[in-house]
Amino acid sequence: MKFNNKKNTFKKRRKVCFFTENKVTKIDFKDIELLQRFITDRGRILSRRVTNTSAKWQRQLAIAIKRARHMALIPFIQQ
């Protein structure tokens, strides 16, 4: 059986981390506009698959969001 590869060929878009692309050195928990981009409308942290962030930056992002929540800069849940 031979498969026609012309139908199934497409170029994958290369996943690029937002923080690596913009040369961010540190994620600050006081930067609410940046953190809001990575939170759902219900207040949950978006996964790496959705945001295309690397593991290093996803860990720092989660810590920054949690710190901002404890400092009452971001609500824990949004209604």
From Swiss-Prot:
This is Small ribosomal subunit protein bS18. One of its GO terms (cellular component) is cytosolic small ribosomal subunit. Pfam families: Ribosomal_S18. Part of the 30S ribosomal subunit. Forms a tight heterodimer with protein bS6. Binds as a heterodimer with protein bS6 to the central domain of the 16S rRNA, where it helps stabilize the platform of the 30S subunit. It comes from Onion yellows phytoplasma (strain OY-M). GO terms for biological process: translation. InterPro entries: Ribosomal_bS18 (IPR001648), Ribosomal_bS18_CS (IPR018275), Ribosomal_bS18_sf (IPR036870). Keywords: Ribonucleoprotein, Ribosomal protein, RNA-binding, rRNA-binding. Belongs to the bacterial ribosomal protein bS18 family. One of its GO terms (molecular function) is structural constituent of ribosome. Transmembrane segments: none annotated.
